[in-house]
Amino acid sequence: MVANKDKATKRKIPAVDDAVKVSTANGKQQTKLKEPVDDESASDYYESDEENLFASIDNGNDEDSTDSEGEGEESDDEEVQEFESADSDFEDESGKDDEEEAEDEEDDADEEDADSADDVNSDSSPEPEEEESDDELEFEEDLEEPEQPKAIQKVIVGRQKKSVEATAEDEDEEDDEETRDLLEAAQKEDEKLGEIDAALGIAPAKTRGVGIFPPEAKSRFKGGKNQDEYAAGDTSDEEDIRNTVGNIPMHWYDEYKHIGYDWEGNRLIKPAKTDAIDDFLKKMEDPNFWRTVKDPQTGQNVVLTDEDIGLIKRIMAGKNPDEQYSDYEPWIEWFTSEVEKMPIRNIPDHKRSFLPSKSEKQKVGRLVHALKMGWIKTRAETERLAALSKGPKFYMIWESDHGKEEMRRIHDHVVAPKRPLPGHAESYNPPPEYLFNEQELAEWNSHEEEPWKRKLHYVPQKFNSLREVPYYDKYIRERFLRCLDLYLCPRGKRTRVTVGPEYLIPKLPSPKDLQPFPTLQNLIYKGHTDMIRSVSIEPKGEYLVTGSDDQTVKIWEVSTARCIRTIPTGDVVRSVAWCPNSKISLIAVASGKRVLLINPQVGDSLLVKKTDDLLAEAPKSETVDNERITTAVQWVDFTEEERKSGVRIVINHFKEIKQVTWHGRGDYFATVMPEAANRSVLIHQLSKRRSQFPFSKSKGLIQCVLFHPVKPCLFVATQRHVRVYDLVKQELLKKLFPSCKWISSMAIHPKGDNLLVATYEKKMMWFDLDLSTRPYQQLKLHHSAIRNVAFHLRYPLFASASDDRSVIVSHGMVYNDLLQNPLIVPLRRLEHHERVNDFGAFDVVFHPTQPWLFSSGADNTVRLYT
């Protein structure tokens, strides 16, 4: 076995002896192997690759590698000394008996088996075992033949075996010399490995092909063939990056046992450090040592592929990194070098090409003007000024006494106002109309003591020629007064403030800061067969009532959108209103010419029974209504069918009713009949079952009325104005001017100090009743007529419904401080209704406690926005 090793050593050592040193342009030496003669073996010969990479690639052990050449030489010398000491030990122990020699041979055999097992393990892959092709096996045999580090290792083993034999002393000396030569060559190769690291700039940032390879990486290059990474089991480049610390300096982990963290947050322990002997043995044993680099991010050794080595060689040779790129492609002559005898365009020169350039003339003119003004200095003037600046400077002794004052006056100089130019009256031969008559002359003379009241400070005169004009006797006086004006009258500058258009726009807060407000459609209440004109909600917010053109009133459950009850009315329902008093359950419905007071029979049964008991018997009234009231309205009894449907009181009117609205306490409610002229508004009292006309005259076509939430006031909106009446004093408090042609509806703030008026002209007017009778702000948010507006009882929100299918929610904050104006910010446009016959959304109402909004439209639906 020793003889076989000696033969292998003698066969592989010439591969090292064949290396020659070639001096490069930068003065350094590189080792270069002799190229094999055979062309076929040259294609599989990798010793040139090994030598080139040995010249520059580091072996990956940053802890043992040194930057300076001197340190590297010392470490190699120490390794040589250690091996010499080992040889001496072997020579001293040559007297061992045969049994110890047999044990040594068995240990060597075990070590060789372990090495072969390591080689097998290093070449193995986690893929399923498959039969290798003949080409791959032949290629592996070719790769194993020129392995230089293995030869060095076998030389060392041969030396150890021969040291046991006492008769091989001469051969040991020759082996020592060969080992020293090999160590010196390896030392120079290590020095050149650092140069490639510096040239490549190996850093944590990965480059293409150079990075951390998974354990399956070897299987992809098995047999020297580059297999598909997905076939090899590598399906993600990001999963290979096990260290998740990022692109940071890795020297931060020098003091720790770990080098980073993996994807699961576990520490990545640094690999065990190896000493110089282990590194040298690895260099001798590992066939891939020359192409192994160390990953600074994980501390592991990475074997470079053939593609990476080819890329490094091309970069070191100064070539293009792309193999497919050719520097010597055939030149394509896009533009011919031959001179064409006939031009492509033979247009005659334009006339302006023969004329001097006007722009150059202007430029020369500007330069001449700058020379005249002294802005541009000639070379002689520039040199003269430079000489003066370098020379001594002289100053006046008393210059500081008046310098600041003079500079201030020059800096703040204000031009004196010019005198007015003379007019026609000051001419020596003015037209006749400019001459004074006797009356004007007497008036001018009468202001002798008050000359500032005269229109002219002189009397116009007429002369036939300029020679007849006498000396102006007031010339000296006028010059004197002019000097007094310049001397005594102060002059000042007026600073003009430039205000941009962006400063005129008020700065509004972001809608995100004004939440909560309705943003999304939550529920749709379907059941009506015609457009829904009005909607109202119970004071507790559990039930909803709607009135439609299908002559029905429906009661819904808010949380489930389920229709609980349907009440037929016999006519079109134009308005519904739930009584705001939570102690009774009652709904007022305006259907045609009747007002129906309906008990919905939902909610608390005790409350329903209490309402029926309250409305069971009509109170006896001692007062007798006049004929004007009895002909307009009658409180009548209901039928049996109406009683079963929940109708408790019926009030007949003589005209069609457009609106019904409740007072805040729930005892009074008002109805509006626009076609009834001076009897358009009626106020009904539920407890006494009597009605009255608040107005004896009508000053316009009344559209809607509204009770004040706190005070005994009534808001009456005609087509163009809004009047506020005091019901106790029975007088007009104020008249509001919305500056519109037709008012559609209005809503009052819960505090009662602000009023919102909607018009059919796409505008909303916000009135501050304490501020003015004119609108505080006009909102033009909709594209069509606005049907209704509403305020929220608790949140600073208001909404508007329009025929453009949209419901706009806005923020309206009213402050307790009377000096601070209300804050109005549009928030969200909700367009979910469908347009039917040019009608969109009809009515809106807020939930009493939640920031929710209900809207009814012409598409027969009610929608809930939350």
Swiss-Prot record:
**Which Gene Ontology molecular function entries are recorded, alphabetically?**
ribonucleoprotein complex binding
Q: Where are the WD repeats?
A: 527-566, 568-608, 697-735, 738-777, 781-820, 836-866
User: Which GO annotations describe the biological process of this protein?
Assistant: maturation of 5.8S rRNA from tricistronic rRNA transcript (SSU-rRNA, 5.8S rRNA, LSU-rRNA); maturation of LSU-rRNA from tricistronic rRNA transcript (SSU-rRNA, 5.8S rRNA, LSU-rRNA)
Which range is the signal sequence, renumbered to this chain?
none
Which InterPro entries does this one have? Answer: BOP1/Erb1, BOP1_N_dom, WD40/YVTN_repeat-like_dom_sf, WD40_repeat_CS, WD40_repeat_dom_sf, WD40_rpt
Task: Quote the HAMAP family the UniProt record gives.
Answer: BOP1
* Superkingdom of source: Eukaryota
Family to which the UniProt record says this protein belongs: Belongs to the WD repeat BOP1/ERB1 family.
Residues of the region (Disordered) are 1-180, 214-241
Record field: compositional bias (Acidic residues)? 37-52, 60-146, 167-179
Question: Tell me, what does this protein do in biology?
Answer: Required for maturation of ribosomal RNAs and formation of the large ribosomal subunit.
Its keywords, alphabetically, are:
Nucleus, Repeat, Ribosome biogenesis, rRNA processing, WD repeat
Where mainly located?
A: nucleus
What SUPFAM superfamilies does this protein's entry cite?
WD40 repeat-like
Q: Which GO terms describe its cellular component?
A: nucleoplasm; PeBoW complex; preribosome, large subunit precursor
Q: Please report the name of this protein according to its UniProt entry.
A: Ribosome biogenesis protein BOP1 homolog
| Subcellular location(s) per record | Nucleus, Nucleolus; Nucleus, Nucleoplasm
